[in-house]
């Protein structure tokens, strides 16, 4: 066995042992101090569980998807230096088309409307 395989096996074994120990050994004793939110030493003013807008979450996820699209398409001008640049153009166009169809679907389903 080469040293790389030994290192991989050792890493997997140690991480598995530590994960199992962390799962089996914790002693959980909940009390009022642990269950209350921490507010810089002051008594809590209200509930720590605030309502969350699912529409905002959807728009944030869509922003992340389209931000990822830009990050994936930025290197495409350098990819045209390969032997077949038409292949790169085809994949980039299919990628943009797929994301555009997803955006149109979200728009038609009303996922981007703020008012109901």
Curated annotation (Swiss-Prot):
Superkingdom classification of source: Eukaryota
UniProt keyword list: Electron transport, Membrane, Mitochondrion, NAD, Respiratory chain, Translocase, Transmembrane, Transmembrane helix, Transport, Ubiquinone
E.C. number: 7.1.1.2
Catalytic activity: a ubiquinone + NADH + 5 H(+)(in) = a ubiquinol + NAD(+) + 4 H(+)(out)
One Gene Ontology MF term: NADH dehydrogenase (ubiquinone) activity
Compartment(s): Mitochondrion membrane
Membrane topology reported for the UniProt record: Multi-pass membrane protein
Parts of the chain that traverse the membrane: 4-24, 56-76, 87-107
Pfam families registered for this protein in UniProt: Oxidored_q4 (PF00507)
A Gene Ontology term for the protein's cellular component: mitochondrial membrane
Family statement: Belongs to the complex I subunit 3 family.
Function of the protein: Core subunit of the mitochondrial membrane respiratory chain NADH dehydrogenase (Complex I) that is believed to belong to the minimal assembly required for catalysis. Complex I functions in the transfer of electrons from NADH to the respiratory chain. The immediate electron acceptor for the enzyme is believed to be ubiquinone.
Name recorded for this polypeptide: NADH-ubiquinone oxidoreductase chain 3
Gene: MT-ND3
């Amino acid at each position: 066995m080469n040293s790389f395989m030994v290192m991989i096996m050792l890493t997997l074994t140690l991480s598995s042992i530590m994960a199992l120990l962390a799962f089996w050994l914790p002693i959980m004793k909940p009390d009022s101090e642990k269950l209350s939110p921490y507010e810089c030493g002051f008594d809590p003013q209200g509930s720590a569980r605030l309502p969350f807008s699912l529409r905002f979450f959807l728009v944030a996820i869509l922003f992340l998807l389209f931000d990822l699209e830009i990050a994936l398409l930025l290197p495409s001008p350098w990819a045209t230096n390969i032997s077949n640049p038409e292949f790169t153009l085809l994949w980039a166009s299919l990628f943009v088309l797929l994301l555009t169809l997803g955006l149109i679907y979200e728009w038609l389903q009303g996922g981007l409307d703020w008012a109901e």
